[in-house]
Amino acid sequence: MATTKSFLILFFMILATTSSTCAKLEEMVTVLSIDGGGIKGIIPAIILEFLEGQLQEVDNNKDARLADYFDVIGGTSTGGLLTAMITTPNENNRPFAAAKDIVPFYFEHGPHIFNYSGSIFGPRYDGKYLLQVLQEKLGETRVHQALTEVAISSFDIKTNKPVIFTKSNLAKSPELDAKMYDICYSTAAAPIYFPPHHFVTHTSNGATYEFNLVDGGVATVGDPALLSLSVATRLAQEDPAFSSIKSLDYKQMLLLSLGTGTNSEFDKTYTAEEAAKWGPLRWMLAIQQMTNAASSYMTDYYISTVFQARHSQNNYLRVQENALNGTTTEMDDASEANMELLVQVGETLLKKPVSKDSPETYEEALKRFAKLLSDRKKLRANKASY
C-alpha cells in the first residue's frame, strides 16, 4: 500500500512537469539501486563486477570504481551491504572494496553469517558474526564519509517509522550520521533471521538518539528503487551542479536497478485449495516470499510506466532474474554448492534479453550504460575545469 501511494505521488508530479527540453548528458542524475535478498546478493554482485569492468575498459583506468560514476547509490538488506562496500572509503579515500571483491566476500563470510545459531523461540541466526565482520570491514566510518550519496533503509520498531540514512539529510537530521556497520547490520536484520539492532548516536550539541532497527525491506519492501529516485530528486533540487533541473523530470535521471532474483513464475507457487489448509505458521513462511515477488514486480512496473510517460524508457534498466528455482530461491542457503549456482545465475543473466520485445541482452545494455556513465563523467569534468 505504501509503495502504491509513493508511486501515485511520483506519477502525478511527473505528469505535472511541463518541461519538454532534452536533458544534457552532463546534467543527468545517475542512480544505482540494489535490492535485498540475503545470500542472493551474489547475483547483483556479478552484475556490478561486469559493469565496473566495463567502466575500467571504456576509461582505460583499472582504478575506476562505481562510486565515481553514480550520484546516488541505494540499497536495502544485502543491497545496503553492497552499497556500503562500494562507497565506504579506505585510508586512501577510495572505495574499500572493488566490485570484483564482493562475490569472494560472500563465499568467505556467508557460511558463517548463515550458520544456525539461534533457537526455536528466537531468530534463526544470532547475528554476532555478521556484526563482527561488518565492524572489521567498515571500522568507525560514518555516513557523512561515504564517497557518494547513499540511501540505505531500515525500520525503527520503537517509533514504527522508516529510517533512511543519507548524506544529504544530515544537516537537518544530524542524528542519522551513524556508523556504517550499525547501518549495514540494521538494514540486514530481517525478522525471523536476525535480531533487531539497537544503537545510539550523539550529535555535536550533546543530544543522544536511540535506534531500534530491523531490515530495510520492511520499509521499502525489498526494492529500494523508488527510495533511491526520491533521494536523487532531492539531490537534484539542492545541488548547484544540477541547477538546470527545475522540477521532477525523469528525462534527467539515469537509473540502474539490480534485483536478487525471484521465483514468481516457476517454483513455489500454490493453489487456493492448498492455501486454504494453511495455519498461521505456514502463512508466515510463505507471505514474505509472496510479498517480495509482488513488490519487485510492481515497483518495476511503476517505474517503467513513469519513464515511458516521459519518453525516457532508455534511461531505466532493471536487471532481474525471474526464474529462480530450487535452493537458489533461499535467502540463507550459503552452502558452497548453492553460492556457485547463484554465480551461474548472474553470469547467465548477462546473456539473456532485457525483454521479450527486444533482442538487446543485459550485457549489451550494461555496456551502453557504461558508455553513458563514462561520457557523462568526462563532460562534467570538462565543465568543472572552465
UniProtKB/Swiss-Prot annotation:
Chain ranges for the short sequence motif GXSXG as given in the UniProt record: 75-79
InterPro entries named in the record: Acyl_Trfase/lysoPLipase, PNPLA_dom
Residues at the catalytic site: S77 (nucleophile), D215 (proton acceptor)
Residues spanned by motif GXGXXG: 36-41
Chief location of this protein within or outside the cell: other
Coiled coil feature spans: 321-384
Family to which this protein belongs: Belongs to the patatin family.
Function: Probable lipolytic acyl hydrolase (LAH), an activity which is thought to be involved in the response of tubers to pathogens.
Protein name (Swiss-Prot/TrEMBL): Patatin-04/09
